[in-house]
């Protein structure tokens, strides 16, 4: 064990440096996220309660079985952009109502794997003793291997294990703000390469053969997106690479790109940028895929976990 250095007069102790760094981090997070809960209007009783200073809010007072009026829809969209992920509890909605809620925020994607019978726009995520969680439990943004990745995803819990199976979310705008200026300068204007490859496992599980795999890989060749994405609503910058789908940086060799990517990937793992959601049946998470990453813990195996996700089409990252 390395001996602890004695405190020298006239020099600041390391703990003071850590404290200063943490205070600076908190200021960066606070500059990105507004901390107060928000009442929708005096007639509705709907309000948002932040989960952490960095990301996440729980919305109470809304019944998602009902169509949202224009004011309420705009308010929900505002909470999504502000908090990056919003949560709803005890929403007893059917698959059709799930889709109707999601369609209020845009056109829906049809995911290439595991659609729900009769509802091709719903992705089924079902794990139990016979279907262990996939090895894609890695920090990521959804479908960045598409030219126009998702705007957002709306995930509902249908069956949950007694304990475990939480999902973590990270604010990638705060992560960008926390970067050293030298790294910001290094990645400014750079594009990263994103690849469909990790989805092969899901396709194989769903029964795809070699010919079908080849068709998917032809349909989804590698794409490039800016490493620093500008949010189309707020204009804020965020880190837009992820450890699951990003495989390189345009114009760099692997040896040059990987150390930089590893630094950027690691920002999502900082607890100061995160919140953690404990699922209950009929809970919903709605996240902004343009500014947040997520990580589904696989600690519940062999117990059952059944989730369904609607995904909203996005635009081309800039």
Predicted regions mapped to residue ranges:
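Short hydrophobic alpha-helical segments enriched in small aliphatic residues
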Residues: 8, 14-17, 21, 31
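Fe(II)/2-oxoglutarate oxygenase catalytic core
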Residues: 39-286, 290-318
């Amino acid at each position: 064990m390395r001996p602890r250095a004695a405190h020298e007069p006239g020099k600041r102790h390391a703990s003071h440096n850590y404290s200063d760094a943490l205070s600076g981090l908190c200021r960066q997070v606070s500059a990105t996220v507004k901390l107060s809960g928000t009442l929708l209007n005096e007639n509705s009783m709907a309000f948002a309660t932040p989960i952490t200073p960095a990301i996440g809010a729980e919305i109470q007072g809304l019944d998602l079985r009902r169509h949202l009026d224009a004011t309420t829809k705009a308010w929900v969209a505002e909470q999504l952009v502000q908090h990056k992920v919003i949560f709803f509890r005890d929403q007893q909605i059917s698959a059709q109502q799930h889709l109707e809620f999601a369609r209020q925020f845009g056109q829906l994607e049809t995911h290439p794997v595991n659609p729900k019978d009769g509802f091709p726009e719903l992705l089924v995520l079902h794990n139990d003793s016979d279907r262990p969680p996939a090895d894609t439990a890695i920090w990521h943004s959804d479908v960045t291997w598409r030219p126009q990745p998702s705007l957002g995803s709306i995930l509902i819990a249908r069956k949950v294990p007694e304990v475990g199976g939480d999902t973590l979310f990270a604010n990638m705008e705060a992560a960008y703000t926390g970067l050293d200026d030298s790294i910001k300068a290094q990645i400014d204007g750079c594009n990263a390469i994103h690849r469909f490859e990790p989805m092969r496992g899901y396709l194989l599980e769903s029964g795809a053969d070699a010919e079908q795999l080849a068709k998917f890989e032809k349909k989804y060749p590698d794409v490039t997106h800016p490493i620093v994405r500008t949010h189309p609503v707020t204009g804020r910058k965020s880190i837009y690479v992820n450890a699951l789908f990003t495989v390189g940086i345009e114009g760099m060799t692997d040896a040059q790109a990987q150390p930089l990517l590893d630094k950027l990937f690691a920002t999502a793992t900082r607890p100061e940028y995160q919140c953690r959601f404990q699922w209950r049946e009929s809970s919903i998470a709605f996240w902004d895929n343009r500014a947040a990453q997520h990580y589904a813990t696989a600690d519940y195996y062999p117990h059952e976990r059944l989730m369904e996700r609607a995904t909203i089409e996005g635009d081309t990252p800039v």
